[in-house]
Amino acid sequence: MPEIRQVMEQVEVELRRATALHGPMRSSHEGLGVLVEEMLELVLAVTTNDLAAVTAEALQVAAMGARIVLDLAPSDPS
């Protein structure tokens, strides 16, 4: 079983790849759309019992969640 640090490093790699490819998210609606798309891909991977795809899609879901926070969260959360 992977360690938390290894998983987070994989999430960071995916986050950086997606940001380099698509740029920052511009709205919460865009963020939701991207996150839902990745979730649907995760659901498909689970329903086909493709564990390699489940892992890849779960990492993408985590990375897109992080992108929403990084790209759209207010600079001063208070």
Predicted segment positions?
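Flexible "arm" and connector segments at domain edges
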Residues: M1-S78
